[in-house]
Design a protein with these regions (language model features):
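Short, well-structured alpha-helical segments in soluble
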Residues: 88-112, 176, 226-238
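Solvent-exposed, acidic/polar segments of extracytosolic/periplasmic ligand-binding ectodomains
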Residues: 364-436
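Extracellular/periplasmic periplasmic-binding protein-like sensory domains
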Residues: 258-331, 341-347, 402-434
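Bacterial N-terminal signal peptides that target proteins for export
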Residues: 2-15
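Extracytoplasmic ligand/sensor domains, especially the bilobed periplasmic-binding protein
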Residues: 56, 96, 111-218, 266-292
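Signal peptide-proximal N-terminal region
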Residues: 56-86, 206-212
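Sec/Tat signal peptide C-region and signal peptidase I cleavage site
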Residues: 22-30
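Extracytoplasmic "Venus flytrap"
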Residues: 37-61, 89-95, 118-119, 187-196, ...
Length: 436
């Protein structure tokens, strides 16, 4: 718990010192700031490997931007010369609590925008509230495709691709690497993320592995922590492949409980969103596991000056390399910066109104440490992006898990085209012209 409090305090200090840092560049008032709520798990099972790295990344990136120390094109101080004033909130506590916390951020703390939410259940709950209040909300991580498939929003954006890319990409990777899958089993959390991930994987498998049979199909509750019964069922099933979208503390617990019982030797483990557990698990993660990171992140990230700035800076600051949640909150912050400065270029350098910010973000694109982000889907409110997959291999010299057999997929190869529901696109054969 000490680490969570330290992050909260340091972000609070960052916010308090915003006005005392380097002088602004640009026509915006010297006293003007851009106040942004940041919501991530700082406690609970989703914190250690997921929420806290996101909080640390927000701290690092906002600190660098407020000093004007970002690489081009992000080298203007803050957002268009305005210092960024963060207000960080713990996402732990459930959807009802997060709805009230979001209202508090807008109505009590008077934030200009909110960047947040890892849980798909939380995203589904808070998106209508932002729309009701007519306030900008930038969802940085949650994966359910339902956000923009079941509703239309003007003030809500998701600055990262949804779960369809994780599962379509995973199946494409498996086929490319000639992974045998006559039979497969699945274990996913029983809420929006796990249900939607499972549906996408099963549907994609039907396209590229049409004869594969589904065996054990398990849906433990989020935060279950104990998987003895489930591991027994998976070992007994003896499937060629065990697929899972488990994440955070649940995934760590599953690996620690299943590996000693030989599951990874009996079946090929394929984990759609798992790079974030590599640092805490270390050599407890077996070799040969196929993993995704929900993007081209961490040890699968591109070699660019922007990624070098982020990867090296984060690693130097915190003693560990950044993983998916850190990348996803960073691309959201940079996306908002891009939109704010785009709006200011149009309005003569003034702090943009909500409507100006919304217009600038809709359909925009920007470079991130993980590659190009394009707001192409959801009427310009839903991002698509590149993604990478690989296998685990322990590096005894570095005393860490490395990733080998890395394959990158372009965004259009693993995401549905505009106006098409993800599951319909998958069942229609995942047609596109961007796959090699």
């Amino acid at each position: 718990m000490k680490s969570f409090k330290r992050i909260t305090r340091s972000l609070g200090m960052l916010a308090a010192s915003a006005g005392a840092m380097l002088a602004f560049t640009g026509p915006s008032s010297a006293q003007e700031t851009f106040k942004v709520g940041i919501v991530t798990f700082l406690s609970g099972p989703a914190a250690e490997s997921f929420g806290v790295p996101a909080g640390k990344a927000a701290e690092f990136v906002i600190g660098e931007l407020n000093k004007g120390a970002g690489p081009a094109p992000y080298n203007k101080v803050g957002f268009g010369g305005m210092k960024i004033e963060p207000v960080i909130i713990d996402e732990n506590g459930g959807a009802t609590k997060q709805v009230q916390e979001l209202r508090n951020l807008y109505q009590r703390d008077n934030v200009d925008a909110v960047i947040g939410y890892i849980s798909s259940g939380d995203c589904l709950a808070v998106a209508p509230i932002a729309e009701e209040l007519k306030k900008p909300l930038f969802l940085f991580d949650c994966g359910t495709p339902r956000i923009f498939e079941e509703a239309k929003y003007n003030y809500v954006f998701r600055t990262a691709a949804h779960a369809t890319q994780d599962n379509v990409g995973l199946i494409r990777y498996m086929k490319m690497k000639n992974i045998k899958m006559d039979t497969f089993s699945a274990i996913n959390q029983d809420y929006a993320w796990g249900q939607d991930s499972r549906a996408d994987f099963v549907a994609a498998a039907a396209q590229l592995y049409p004869n594969a049979k589904l065996g054990a199909d398990l849906l433990p509750k989020f935060g279950a922590g104990q998987y003895g019964t489930e591991v027994s069922a998976l070992v007994a099933a003896g499937s060629d492949v065990v697929y899972s979208s488990l994440w955070g503390g649940d995934l760590q617990a599953f690996i620690l409980q299943s590996v000693p019982r030989g599951l990874a030797k009996r079946s090929q483990l394929v984990l759609s969103a798992s790079d974030h557990v590599l640092p805490p698990l270390g050599d407890k993660m077996p070799d040969g596991v196929i993993i995704g990171a929900r993007g081209a992140y961490g040890l699968m990230s591109p070699k660019t000056p922007l990624n070098e700035w982020f990867f090296s800076g984060y690693e130097k600051a915190y003693g560990v390399y950044p993983v998916q949640a850190a990348y996803r909150v960073t691309q959201s912050i940079l996306g908002v910066k891009n939109a704010v400065e785009k709006a200011m270029a149009k309005n003569g350098g003034k702090k943009p109104s909500t409507d100006e910010l919304v217009a600038a973000m809709t359909g925009s694109e920007w470079q991130s440490p993980g590659g190009l982000i394009q707001m192409k889907n959801g009427d310009g409110h839903q991002a698509i992006q590149p993604i990478a997959f690989s296998r685990t291999k322990y590096n005894a010299e570095k005393k860490r898990i490395d990733l080998v057999d890395i394959v990158n997929f372009e965004a259009e190869c693993v995401n549905p085209p505009p106006g098409v529901k993800a599951i319909d696109w998958i069942k229609g054969g995942m047609k596109n012209d961007k796959c090699k």
